[in-house]
């Protein structure tokens, strides 16, 4: 008879990204984690983007408004903080680390049936890299691997493409080296960010769109982001859509074979390389004109719409 392993026993460590001055967020999150062994919770001092070398200097900040400078500093600090968590997990030789942003809001304690299902998924998947317990889907198809009925409705764990939002996810040790090699350090963060834009954009468009990697996610989200003042957007923001007890994000479930074929389909590959080319072009734009904070994106306006917005912004400068 197999031994039942609880979720919080299966996770080797929990890294919580928290800016030193945001003690309010740290205290609120700790209230949600009282059932987690205290020795597993590790506060990771977040990088304050405004304190990075070359902030508001060099070509990337040419002509930037204060709002734009703060926005990109927030993004840089965020991605370096996530990189620090991965490095921390590797240094401690953890096999599985749960990484949390300090605005995470759990909709289940993960101490019962849902948590047990998550453990079974991780045990049964012979090779996986990331498991998102909360995210914004970036691709409309997913392949279910396990489902469970709960008082709040059905919860499905599925193989997904890299999503957006990174407030609650598990990283397996098999991903540490690739992530650390690809993510920037303080020395090259401004250059890296010009092309890759942000941490979750890199996951959605690059790291999580490779056939050899297995990215997992949950429908609906087991963890969302609470209403707090955002140190990136610089206003109150909340990402609570698709949470447990609500309608899940729209998704079409397909079988494993169909999902695997997607990575090799001409349409998928064309869109992937078009997106990478668009990001490369945007990187050159930032090098020539400095960072900008556009009101539209490729995702919301399409390639032509985003190009027109960029040209309009360029004319104003």
Descriptions of predicted regions:
Residues 1-100, 104-317:
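An acidic/histidine-cluster motif and surrounding catalytic segment
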């Amino acid at each position: 008879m197999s031994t039942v392993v609880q979720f919080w026993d299966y996770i080797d460590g929990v890294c919580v990204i928290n800016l030193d001055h945001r003690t309010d967020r740290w205290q609120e999150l700790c209230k949600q984690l009282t059932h987690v062994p205290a020795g597993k919770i590790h506060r990771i001092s977040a990088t304050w983007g405004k304190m990075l070398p070359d902030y508001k200097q060099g070509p990337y900040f040419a002509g930037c408004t204060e709002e734009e400078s703060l926005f990109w500093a927030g993004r840089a600090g965020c991605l370096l903080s996530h990189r620090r968590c991965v490095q921390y997990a590797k240094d401690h030789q953890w096999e599985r680390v749960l990484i949390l942003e300090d605005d995470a809001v759990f909709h289940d304690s993960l101490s019962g049936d849902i948590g047990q299902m998550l453990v079974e998924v991780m045990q049964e998947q012979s090779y996986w890299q990331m498991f998102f317990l909360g995210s914004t889907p970036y691709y409309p198809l997913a392949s279910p691997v396990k489902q469970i009925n709960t008082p709040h409705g059905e919860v499905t764990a599925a193989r997904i493409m890299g999503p957006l939002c990174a407030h609650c996810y598990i990283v397996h040790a098999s991903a540490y080296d690739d992530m650390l090699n690809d993510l920037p350090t303080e020395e090259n963060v401004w250059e890296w960010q010009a092309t890759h834009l942000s941490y979750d954009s890199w996951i959605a468009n690059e790291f999580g769109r490779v056939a050899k990697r297995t990215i997992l996610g949950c429908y609906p989200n087991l963890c969302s982001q609470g209403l707090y003042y955002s140190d990136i957007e610089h206003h109150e923001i909340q990402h609570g859509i698709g949470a447990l007890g609500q309608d899940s994000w729209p998704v079409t479930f397909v079988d494993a074979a169909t999902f695997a074929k997607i990575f090799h389909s001409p349409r998928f590959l064309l869109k992937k390389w078009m997106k990478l080319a668009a990001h490369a072009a945007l990187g050159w734009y930032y090098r020539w004109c400095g960072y900008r904070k556009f009101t539209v994106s490729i995702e919301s306006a399409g390639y032509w719409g985003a190009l027109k917005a960029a040209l309009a912004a360029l004319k104003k400068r």
